[in-house]
A protein has these predicted regions:
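Conserved Rossmann-fold NAD(P)-dependent oxidoreductase catalytic core, especially the SDR/UDP-sugar
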Residues: 85, 103, 107-146
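N-terminal Rossmann/SDR dinucleotide-binding element
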Residues: 1-82
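Structural signature of the Rossmann-like NAD(P)-dependent dehydrogenase/reductase core
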Residues: 14-15, 85, 123-126, 168-174
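NAD(P)H-binding glycine-rich loop region in Rossmannoid oxidoreductase-like domains
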Residues: 65-103, 135
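Residues at the starts of beta-strands that form the adenosine-phosphate
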Residues: 35-37, 122-123, 166
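NAD(P)-dependent short-chain dehydrogenase/reductase
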Residues: 18, 144, 157-197
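Conserved active-site helix of classical SDR/Rossmann-fold NAD(P)-dependent CH-OH oxidoreductases
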Residues: 27, 109-110, 150-157, 161, ...
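Active-site segment of SDR-like NAD(P)-dependent oxidoreductases
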Residues: 89-91, 130-134, 173-176
């Protein structure tokens, strides 16, 4: 059975789809026949408009990843059958607001895991980061963002161990291309966009 057949007609929740990776995920899901349901703090279709001609057709639900009640409401409304969790504040934002970023990155992740547990969702992936593993000879984490991501991986492992909630964590390294205009690895994309002008 192909992936497109498995996903056709199914609603997949994408948190953080206003970002670069999320926009590309929404585009791919549409092409596979799935129904992407974007959950983000603000409706910003700028990156979607950059890469897909039918960006307005994507369902967009406003909400804060730290609001579990709102997440549950969206999941019930759209009969969500899969989750791709990408919502997070990146390195510079974590450094600027340690408490707020921990609330979003860590509490947001536990809310997604709990949503999957309560709704019986068995198709879930989440973005970790190459920043998650310890670096150097002393096994230290270089950023608070990395600490958030390793925490997310550990919480996902416990949700599997204690409640059999399956998930797949992905550790992207350098992200570049259309739509990548924030974060530590945005410079190549920003330079390419500037060169096109």
């Amino acid at each position: 059975m192909s992936h497109s057949t498995e996903l056709a007609g199914k609603a997949v929740l994408i948190t953080g789809a206003a970002g670069c990776i999320g926009a590309w995920v929404a585009k791919q899901l549409r092409e596979l026949g799935a129904t992407p349901v974007v959950f983000d703090i603000a409706e910003n279709r700028e990156r979607l408009n950059l890469i897909m001609p039918d960006a307005e057709a994507v369902i967009w639900e406003l909400g804060d990843i730290t609001d579990f009640k709102r997440l549950l409401e969206v999941a019930e409304t759209h009969n969500i059958e899969g989750i791709i969790h990408l919502a997070a504040l990146q390195v510079p934002f974590c450094k600027a607001d340690p408490v707020g970023s921990t609330r979003i990155n860590v509490m947001g992740s536990i809310h997604i895991l709990e949503l999957a547990r309560q709704r019986g969702i068995t198709r879930m992936s989440y973005a970790s980061s190459v920043a998650a593993p310890a670096m150097g000879d002393n096994d230290w984490l270089a950023t608070l963002y990395g600490a958030h991501k390793i925490c997310g991986e550990q919480m996902a492992a416990v949700y599997w161990q204690d409640w059999a909630v399956p998930s797949v964590g992905i550790r992207p390294a350098v992200i570049y291309g259309p739509g990548r205009d924030q974060g530590m690895s945005a410079a190549p994309s920003v330079a390419l966009m500037a060169a096109e002008v």
